[in-house]
């Protein structure tokens, strides 16, 4: 089972007390994507940090601006620990339906992470019969989500939105090992940003199909953006398979940001009464 999140979920109970706004968790709709950042007030990257005890740290995000109060008072916040005792195994959610395509992109240092944004149509995913358009991806180290308390070395978030502003994010976890081929294509651009004061760089055409997922299994739950304004009602899909990345690639993502911080991972948030589902295809669906 090397490279897979450890899952033995048969007979796991469903979390009770679903809220109405958890409409997507128990439905028979298609999977979702992790979209995590540009809703409501666009965060000023210098206005918050990840330092424990800092006046701008995660415990204080909800007090910095009124528009960020959900970071403190929300009850569907992300990330969470994907504890197997809470997870209900389902087979009706269906495979992730991705229809990505190459498009012009830019790489931007947001002060707390590196964000790759597609300027044109980079394709979409289908979630619950709705098309979510791929907007950007960014990285957190170490991972923000945990599995049975285990934190991984890196987490990629692929942010998708509908024209009406609904958000879905797909998260992919990484452990130290062989190089990630998608990050390898961005190495020269990351190094260029780390060696200069530039905050943004045109990286030409980038094909999101080169982001490897490698598993049909995934977790799904309703949560929030993991950075201010911590907007809720985000559909999260966390891919079951753990990919690999080199330590040098993880370090480069941090060095290029110039924030002198060893982490940009938000602490784990209370799950409250939310449901967490784990999609596992039926035997007849595997072909």
Model-assigned labels for residue ranges:
Residues 1-287:
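Alpha-carbonic anhydrase
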């Amino acid at each position: 089972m090397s490279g897979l999140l450890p899952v033995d979920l048969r007979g796991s109970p469903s979390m009770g007390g679903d809220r109405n706004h958890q409409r997507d968790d128990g439905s028979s709709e298609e999977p979702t994507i992790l979209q995590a950042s540009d809703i409501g007030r666009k965060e000023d990257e210098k206005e918050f940090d990840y330092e424990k005890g800092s006046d701008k740290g995660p415990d204080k995000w909800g007090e910095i601006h009124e528009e960020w109060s959900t970071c403190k008072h929300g009850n569907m916040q992300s990330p969470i620990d994907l504890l197997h005792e809470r997870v209900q195994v389902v087979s009706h959610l269906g495979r992730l339906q991705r229809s990505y395509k190459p498009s012009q992109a830019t790489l931007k240092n947001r002060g707390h992470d590196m964000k790759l944004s597609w300027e044109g149509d980079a394709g979409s995913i289908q979630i619950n019969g709705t098309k979510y358009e791929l907007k950007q991806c960014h990285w957190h180290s170490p991972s923000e989500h945990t599995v049975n308390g285990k934190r991984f070395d890196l987490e990629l978030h692929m942010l998708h939105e509908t024209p009406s502003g609904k958000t879905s994010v797909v998260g992919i976890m990484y452990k130290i090992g062989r190089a990630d081929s998608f990050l390898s294509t961005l190495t020269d651009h990351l190094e260029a940003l780390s060696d200069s004061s530039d905050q943004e760089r045109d990286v030409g055409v980038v094909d999101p199909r080169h982001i490897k997922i490698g598993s049909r299994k995934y977790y799904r739950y309703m949560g929030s953006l993991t950075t201010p304004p911590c907007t809720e009602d985000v559909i999260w899909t966390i891919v079951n398979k753990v990919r690999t990345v080199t330590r040098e690639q993880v370090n480069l993502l941090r060095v290029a940001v110039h924030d002198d911080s060893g982490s940009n991972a938000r602490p784990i948030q209370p799950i409250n009464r939310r449901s967490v589902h784990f999609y596992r295809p039926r035997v007849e669906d595997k072909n």
